[in-house]
Amino acid sequence: MNKEILGVLLVSLVVLISGCTMPFGGGGEKQTAMAGTQGLTILYFGPDVEYPVSGQSINLEARIKNVGDAVAKNVEGEIYLLSWGSTNIAKGADLNPPDPEVGREGEEDRLTWRVEAPKVTKTQTYDVGVHVRYNYTTTTVATIYAFSRTEYRKRMERREPIPKVKNIVNSNSPVHVDVRVQNILRTGSTDVPITLVFKNVGGGNVEYNNNTKHYIIKRATVKIGDSTKGCSNIPMKGGREGYCTVRVDIPSTSDEVKLPIEITTIYQYEISAETKISVHPEFE
């Protein structure tokens, strides 16, 4: 009996490690991991029937959910890889984010495409993928520090830390922003460069511009103290990271100035998922 129990436990362990408990697509094919971790995520992509047969009309569906902190707007999906798939763009609804304070989860939606399986005389397996695009917003806040010459000397003498930027916080979104300054800032300085670093952290891609051949961030609005700056069409190198520099004047109202900075970044984001569909011959 102990040997039988041990055997069951070992089989269960192998199943867990191999990932065989993941959802399956139509025709018994294991579904690939879904992209999208901060913003929209794809919960499931595949056919709406478990056993597609030759010539059958079926729906391909993508179930999506907003797990970020902003409203997902202009949601749309497009099928790729599948030669007999639909070329139509499926439009989705705007999806609200979760609200933990009231215990509300992020909104979900379902994108569907009606297709007809090909005629087959033996079981054939096809690759199919979906791109889901949406507009999203990242909100970033931080504090920039500046010091007078007197305060700077005092801190050096006391061997105290002299911060440049602190408390950078990004909303739960697929693009994050880092705030960097090259040198310790002095109060009363003018035309000081502040570098914003945009990072793709969501498992997908920002919009691709066919004219410039770059992935781009549409725009970023930067509020620093009482001034508002902006950047637009920010290229993302390799789709992973982009830069924008804004210039600001530092007031000299005190020996230590703390400048709040708020960055609102707007962009289109795309996530993708792929699976396999097995089409079987008709029953005789």
Region locations from a protein language model:
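Non-catalytic macromolecular-recognition regions in eukaryotic signaling proteins
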Residues: 20-284
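Secretory targeting signatures
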Residues: 1-30
